[in-house]
């Protein structure tokens, strides 16, 4: 415990510049970034009861929720989007609700959703 008390005492005596340099060295040594931890820790102190920022979703799953009346058009669009064969695309469409494509960017997910909805399907992004 005496060693820990000495470390605390040494850290307390650092100047702001020395503390910043220490943080930089520790980030390099441990392969981490203190910026996110500092921002989250400083957020509630500065804003009182402010919540931590919500992380924006970057990967989406396009889910075929319902086929609608134009089953053939939806099958064609699923084939174009996924690259599946006719039978595989038909099986996927008939098994709705079913994921069509997983791990895609928001832009690509929106394009796929628009194309499938234009073909007559009901689509969800998750």
From Swiss-Prot:
Gene Ontology CC, one term: cytosolic large ribosomal subunit
GO biological process: translation
Domain of life: Bacteria
GO molecular function annotation: mRNA binding; structural constituent of ribosome
Keywords: Ribonucleoprotein, Ribosomal protein
Pfam families: Ribosomal_L12, Ribosomal_L12_N
Function field: Forms part of the ribosomal stalk which helps the ribosome interact with GTP-bound translation factors. Is thus essential for accurate translation.
Family: Belongs to the bacterial ribosomal protein bL12 family.
Subunit description: Homodimer. Part of the ribosomal stalk of the 50S ribosomal subunit. Forms a multimeric L10(L12)X complex, where L10 forms an elongated spine to which 2 to 4 L12 dimers bind in a sequential fashion. Binds GTP-bound translation factors.
Record PANTHER family: 39S RIBOSOMAL PROTEIN L12, LARGE RIBOSOMAL SUBUNIT PROTEIN BL12M
Protein name (record): Large ribosomal subunit protein bL12
């Amino acid at each position: 415990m005496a060693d820990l008390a000495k470390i605390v005492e040494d850290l307390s005596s650092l100047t702001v510049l020395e503390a910043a340099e220490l943080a930089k060295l520790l980030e390099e040594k441990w392969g981490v970034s203190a910026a996110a931890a500092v921002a989250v820790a400083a957020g509630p102190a500065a804003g009182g009861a402010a919540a931590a920022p919500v992380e924006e979703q970057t990967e989406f799953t396009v889910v075929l929720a319902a086929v609608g009346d134009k089953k053939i058009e939806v099958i064609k669009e699923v084939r174009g989007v996924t690259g599946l064969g006719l039978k595989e695309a038909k099986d996927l469409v008939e098994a709705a609700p079913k994921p069509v494509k997983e791990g895609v960017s928001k832009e690509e997910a929106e394009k796929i959703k628009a194309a499938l909805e234009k073909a007559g399907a009901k689509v969800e992004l998750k």
